């Protein structure tokens, strides 16, 4: 505890770090305030139907990422997800399309062009998602006894503009946090949205256990299990297999370079949360089509509408394993890694440079991906197991899935950046032993 207090004091002593933390706090407060500003023409008291719809599935994920703005019909309802969707599309195009590959190699100018294209694509996605959200909102409001006229009218046009402007403003806040605050701004906004739901979830679970059964001991056991799941997620995020690399000695004038041994850190979960996001998007398709299909098809889709059911989670876990292999194969290029080693006079001891090195790295990644994908699938379905044992829906979401991995990853990245600022000013880090915090970026090749 003394070490922790001393670290906080050191953080406050550094003017730049103190300024960044206060700036981050200011932007977070602005974001949270906007999450409660309801769209004009919407009666906030009639939003219970929409909030009930977001208790499970992809809707719950969107609502959690937006910190409740989605179910509040806020001007920030669409949140940062359209920008993330656009970024994922551009990332995939960078791998598959030569034009984007060339742009990526242009350095800072290429990065600025790709950022601009990402923003344009974000606007296009918002122009589609805005009216779609309003149609869904009108259906849910009708169930609550309040009509919302959605069509080519002033309400739809003005609300779509507000939703698009709100989402772009959230994106701007994220970029400002990255530039002037602490951590990656976009990831930090998602983290805030997730954490904002935690106090309400834990109070609801506490009240449920006291009133409906289980008592205080069961609640304490749930907290202990939650901490254990967090520790497990940290191990999954930070787990790496280090491949030793030797660099050949070379003489430049009278000086000798090379001859040192380094490591290539290959992550157990190189794909991070992307397989879960892809799998959830696929699992949402039958639910979205349920209203347009026959009664026989609806009977089939009902099995997938229950995200606590066996078939939903079995298919969900299988899709995560498949997408983990798929996405890892996209982002990890053993041939390129072997070529880079060869160009820098590096080699893996006992392995011939070139093709043999690429095959060796590919074999290691294949062996790592199998346990990594299975562990990722287990984390993804843990909320369903929690629900099976009587944990409330809102609290069960913190036992696994995308939200847990994002929380762990962003917190580690933010703490690593704070620790780096401390070390730059010759202060100690968070640990007395000298151990350093490793974020996700520190383990990328």
Regions found by a protein language model. Give the residues of each.
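N-terminal cationic and glycine-rich segments that engage phosphates or anionic surfaces
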Residues: 1-104, 109-445
């Amino acid at each position: 505890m003394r070490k922790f207090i001393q670290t906080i004091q050191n953080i406050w002593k550094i003017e730049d770090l103190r300024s960044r933390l206060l700036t981050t706090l200011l932007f977070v407060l602005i974001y949270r305030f906007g999450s409660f500003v309801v769209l004009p023409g919407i009666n906030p008291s009639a939003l219970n139907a929409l909030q009930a719809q977001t208790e499970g599935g992809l809707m719950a994920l969107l609502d959690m990422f937006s910190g409740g703005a989605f179910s509040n019909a806020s001007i920030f309802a669409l949140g940062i997800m359209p920008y993330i969707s656009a970024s994922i599309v551009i990332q995939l195009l960078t791998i598959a399309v030569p034009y984007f590959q060339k742009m990526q190699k242009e350095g800072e100018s290429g990065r600025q062009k790709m950022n601009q294209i990402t923003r344009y694509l974000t606007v296009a996605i918002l122009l589609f998602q805005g009216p779609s959200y309003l149609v869904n909102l009108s259906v849910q409001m009708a169930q609550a006894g309040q009509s919302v006229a959605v069509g080519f009218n002033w309400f739809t046009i003005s609300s779509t503009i507000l939703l698009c402007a709100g989402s772009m403003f959230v994106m701007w806040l994220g970029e400002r946090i990255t530039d002037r605050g602490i951590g990656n701004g976009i990831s930090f906004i998602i983290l805030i949205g997730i954490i904002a739901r935690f106090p309400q979830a834990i109070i609801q679970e506490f009240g449920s256990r006291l009133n409906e059964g289980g008592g205080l001991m069961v609640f304490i056991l749930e907290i202990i299990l939650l901490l254990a799941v967090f520790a497990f997620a940290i191990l999954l995020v930070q787990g790496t297999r280090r491949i030793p690399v030797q660099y050949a000695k070379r003489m430049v004038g009278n000086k000798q370079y090379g001859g040192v041994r380094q490591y290539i850190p290959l992550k157990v979960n190189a794909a991070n949360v992307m397989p879960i996001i892809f799998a959830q998007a696929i699992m949402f398709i039958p639910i979205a089509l349920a209203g347009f299909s026959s009664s026989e098809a609806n009977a089939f889709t009902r099995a997938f509408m229950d995200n606590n059911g066996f078939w939903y989670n079995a298919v969900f876990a299988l899709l995560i394993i498949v997408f983990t292999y798929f996405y890892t194969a996209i982002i990890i290029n053993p041939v390129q890694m072997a070529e880079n080693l060869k160009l820098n006079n590096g080699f893996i001891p006992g392995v011939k440079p070139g093709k043999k090195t690429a095959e060796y790295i590919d074999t290691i990644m294949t062996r790592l991906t199998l346990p990594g994908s299975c562990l990722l699938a287990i984390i993804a379905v843990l909320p369903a197991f929690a629900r099976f044992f009587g944990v409330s829906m809102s609290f069960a979401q913190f036992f696994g899935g995308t939200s847990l991995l994002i929380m762990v990853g962003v917190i580690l990245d933010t703490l690593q950046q704070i620790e780096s600022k401390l070390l730059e000013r010759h202060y100690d880090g968070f640990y007395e032993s000298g151990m350093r915090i490793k974020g996700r970026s520190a383990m990328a090749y």
